[in-house]
Amino acid sequence: MANDTMIDSTQLRRSPAAHLAAAMEAAEVAGERAVTLREVAFTTQLGLRAVPGSTGHAALAAATGVGLPAAVGEVAGDVSGTAVLWLGPDEFLLAAEENPALLDTLQGALGQEPGQVLDLSANRSVLQLEGPAAALVLRKSCPADLHPREFGVNRAITTSLANIPVLLWRTGEQSWRILPRASFTEHTVHWLIDAMSEFSAAEVA
């Protein structure tokens, strides 16, 4: 007899940092130098390619609902909804809460025009680092200038952290999203936990 039982695949999946959740929670620091780390699991990430000024670029800009960023560091939209991060003159990353329908929407908008819309949701993990000490943790191994004058809220760049390439997105005054390749998630989490440990001790006057 055939087994017609339907299996919901979402019940079987595991995010890149799922096995590290307890370690991240245990590393949380409270107080004046507070800092927390968590995974934002199963976000939708779409890679967009289109040449500025082209019909395809205009179609994708309209379909995202927030446009496309025009220069390095720019983000169209924000973390509360759909956001599009600038990766290159004709390359962008759309980031949103889980929404599989976005892929069909963007592919339909591009149609037969030159360009690409690819599902990259499994390509990168998303880590959220928050708190007054978050920027200090990042500065231990990130070469980018993180001063608010140079790296304001809702800016994003490609940089490195703990010697691996990441996308770094400042989502608030004291909050950052770090997007390493999924295969580097464990390395990144362990490095951040180690960097956070300093701030659990009393500050030396």
UniProtKB/Swiss-Prot annotation:
InterPro entries: SoxG (IPR007375), SoxG_het (IPR006280), TrmE/GcvT_dom1 (IPR027266). It comes from the Bacteria. Inhibited by Zn(2+), Cu(2+), Cd(2+), Hg(2+), Ag(+), p-chloromercuribenzoate (p-CMB), iodoacetamide, N-ethylmaleimide, CN(-), o-phenanthroline and sodium lauryl sulfate. It catalyses: sarcosine + (6S)-5,6,7,8-tetrahydrofolate + O2 = (6R)-5,10-methylene-5,6,7,8-tetrahydrofolate + glycine + H2O2; sarcosine + O2 + H2O = formaldehyde + glycine + H2O2. GO terms for molecular function: sarcosine oxidase activity. One of its GO terms (cellular component) is cytoplasm. One of its GO terms (biological process) is sarcosine catabolic process. Optimum temperature is 37 degrees Celsius. It holds the Pfam family SoxG. It is an enzyme of class 1 (oxidoreductase). It is found in: Cytoplasm. Keywords: Cytoplasm, Oxidoreductase. Its EC number is 1.5.3.24. Optimum pH is 7.7 in potassium phosphate buffer and 8.0-8.5 in glycylglycine buffer. Heterotetramer composed of subunits alpha (SoxA), beta (SoxB), gamma (SoxG) and delta (SoxD). In the presence of tetrahydrofolate, catalyzes the oxidative demethylation of sarcosine to yield glycine, 5,10-methylenetetrahydrofolate and hydrogen peroxide. In the absence of tetrahydrofolate, catalyzes the oxidative demethylation of sarcosine to yield glycine, formaldehyde and hydrogen peroxide. Can also use N-methyl-L-alanine and N-ethyl-L-glycine. Is very specific for oxygen as an acceptor. Belongs to the SoxG family. This is Sarcosine oxidase subunit gamma. It comes from Corynebacterium sp. (strain U-96).
